[in-house]
Amino acid sequence: MAKQRVFVLGLDAVPPSLLKTLKGGIPNLTRFLETSEYGPLESTHPPITCPAWATMATGKDPGELGVYGFRNRTGPGYDHLKMVSSRDIQAPSVWDLLSQRGKEVIVVAVPPGYPPKPVKGYFVSCFLTPGHKNSFTYPEDFKEELLKISPKYKFDVMNFRTPEKERILKEIYELTDQHFKLVHHFLKTKPWDFFMFTEIATDRLHHAFWKYFDSSHPKHDSASKFKDAIPDYYRYLDSLIGKTFELLDDKTTVFLVSDHGSKAIHGGIGINEFLIREGYLVLKQEELKKNLLIEPTLLVSPCLPAGNQNHVIGVSPEIIDWKKTRAWGEGGYYARVFINKKGREPEGIVLESEFEPLKLKLREKLQAIPDENGNTLDTKVLFPEEIYPLITGIPPDLMVYFDNLNWRAIGTIGYPSLYVSENDTGPDDSNHSQDGVYAFKNSQTQKKKVEGMKIHQISQKILEVY
């Protein structure tokens, strides 16, 4: 019997519509898609890199994983927020299960992949890696071999939300080149039965250059010298993918997947500004004044005390009056709202009998927020218990997709209105969309359009090959 091999190529943040638009400039990808089982891949709720790739690898949804974004509450305290790592994924990944079966596996840059996990084969950590001084390969001694291939091996594009577009673009190409150089080295020199690789540079490209590409973007700039940044990069990426496919034999089963899509970002809505204005979040005025010794902006906010209305600040626990606060929020791709529940939070004030009515009232108010011109937004407010059969960890009480993720959530305060034109972490052109890409091909595959594939189904489909 022929040896069963599976190669999974992950492209972060690629929507099906993008590959369709670029069809003429990406011949290798187009050829693959036109001879495969292909369709949209519904992402997790929320559609964020972490937890989406972990769900793909384990078959477990964010509720089962206890991972609701890049930062997660680890305890009842107000400051118990921790960046996700591979240690947080307790469910076995497909490479864990295959390692247990004696299969040789290679995993490269699949988030959350730091610190590296022991496998029967090789594991190279992802963009969460702090730097070369840290252990980022398994086995550890492979690090020396990797650095001989790429002495300045990159894990990510640093500070990709910045006006430094030329620097970002240069680093995107460097990152991609180094990743594929490593992948090709593995394919040529190491034994494997299962290989999974994720390219994060596509996500960074979209965040930095989407407005130059997407004519529907509210800040579309077709005259910019970066107007071809996205199609040019995908032509380059396609050439590397073509070289990768040449290193695979015809008996290899190939998956092409993305964890979520991308779309134009229209701006940001201040979740904590909203909660303050509605009386749900109360700040300590004296502590607030102490925290205003920071770089000022030219903004004015009714949420800040008189004489200090020219600053944007983060809402840290020490400036919140918890004895008067019923809810607070965290910004990001989506808004996370936590209720200050008595008996759960250290200084909770919302009684059990008030908890559900407050959630419903907040949902009603959040869904009623219009855009800056008074137009209705398609805001979705989800309760974790409505979307996850099992809940572990500490999820938000409300998950808010402003205008179905056309707007980001802004956690900082100090703006003249609820609406901001830029992400509060830096210039950003795109937010995430729900559908990524799914394509599957083996020696028997006939071209087939598929609908309804969900990201948690991928791990089982991989295991079925063996």
Where are these regions (language model features)?
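A structural signal for well-ordered alpha-helical segments within the folded catalytic domains
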Residues: 27, 51, 89-96, 177, ...
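Histidine-centered active-site/metal-ligand motif
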Residues: 203-207, 216-218, 260, 427-432
